[in-house]
Amino acid sequence: MRNTVSTFQELKNKGEKITMLTAYDYSMAKLIDSSGINGILVGDSLGMVCLGYENTLSVTMEDMLHHTKAVVRGTSNALVVGDMPFMSYQTSIYDAVYNAGRFIKEAGAHAVKLEGGATVAEEIKAIVKAQIPVMGHIGLTPQSVNMFGGFKVQGKNEKVAKKLIEDAKILEEAGAFSIVLECIPEKLSKIISESISIPTIGIGAGKYCDGQILVYQDMLSMFSDFKPKFVKSFGNIGESIKDGVSQYIKEVKEAKFPEEKHAFKIDDDVINKLY
C-alpha cells in the first residue's frame, strides 16, 4: 500500500520513526522502494550528485520533472515528494502554485517540497489550497547558500534558534504536512519537533526528529566530492562499483569476457555457407 501524507502523521502520532531517502532515477527508486522506505524525495540535490553542479541553484523545473517522472515509475509504496527548484516559487504565488501543480499533474508526484520559513508561508497556503500537499524545509536551505556564505549549521545562536522555532510553527499553520530540518543543533531540533504537531524530518539535525532523510549517494559512499559530517556510511557501494568496472576492463583486455555461456549460437551449416 502506498504511503501517504496521512501515513507520515500516523507514524509521528504513534512514535514510530519516518524513513526517507532521495532518488533520481527509475532503477534506484525501485531498489529503495522495495526496501520498505516510507518516502522518497526527488531532491534538487540531483544538480550536485547527478549533474555535477557546484550547488543546487542551476537546477530547472524541466530537470526536476524529468527525474521525478522516472522515480514515480519505479515506486509503488513510497510517498514521492518533488523538490521545487530555485526560482520556481520565489517569483510569485501564481508561479508557486503552477509549478507545484506540474509536479503532480505531469510528473505524478504525491507532494512537493519548498525551502524557507515565514517568507514562503503565503506560497504554501496557496499550494495547499490547490489541494497539493507541501513539505516545508528550514535550517540550512541550500537554495540560500549565497546568503549563508556556504553550507553552514544554522540556529547556533538564540536569535536564529528562536526564528527557526517560529518558522516551524508558521509553516504548520500555513498547511505544511511535514518539515525538513537541515543542519541544526540536535537539541534545537528536539524543541522544534515538540513545538509542532506535524512530523519533522531531519538531515544533520540529530536523533530527536520524527524521521530522517539522507542523499542515497552519501549514505552508500557513492559521492566522493565531499562527505557531510552528519552522514553515516551504510555501505561502500562506490568502491564496489570501481572494483567491478576494473574487473570488467581486465577481463575484456585479456579476452576472458565474454565467455561461451554469454554468446548466442548459430548452426554450423549456416556458418559454412557464409564463407
Curated annotation (Swiss-Prot):
What pathway is this protein said to act in by its record?
A: Cofactor biosynthesis; (R)-pantothenate biosynthesis; (R)-pantoate from 3-methyl-2-oxobutanoate: step 1/2
Q: Which UniProt keywords apply?
A: Cytoplasm, Magnesium, Metal-binding, Pantothenate biosynthesis, Transferase
- Which EC number applies? 2.1.2.11
Q: Tell me the CDD domains matching this sequence.
A: KPHMT-like
Q: Where does Mg(2+) bind?
A: D44, D83, E115
Task: Note the coiled coil stretches, chain numbering.
Answer: none
Q: Which GO terms describe its molecular function?
A: 3-methyl-2-oxobutanoate hydroxymethyltransferase activity; magnesium ion binding
Which coenzyme or cofactor does it need? Answer: Mg(2+)
NCBIfam families reported in the protein's UniProt record: panB (TIGR00222), PRK00311.1 (NF001452)
PANTHER family listed in its UniProt record: 3-METHYL-2-OXOBUTANOATE HYDROXYMETHYLTRANSFERASE (PTHR20881:SF0)
Protein name in UniProt: 3-methyl-2-oxobutanoate hydroxymethyltransferase
Name the species this protein comes from: Clostridium botulinum (strain Langeland / NCTC 10281 / Type F)
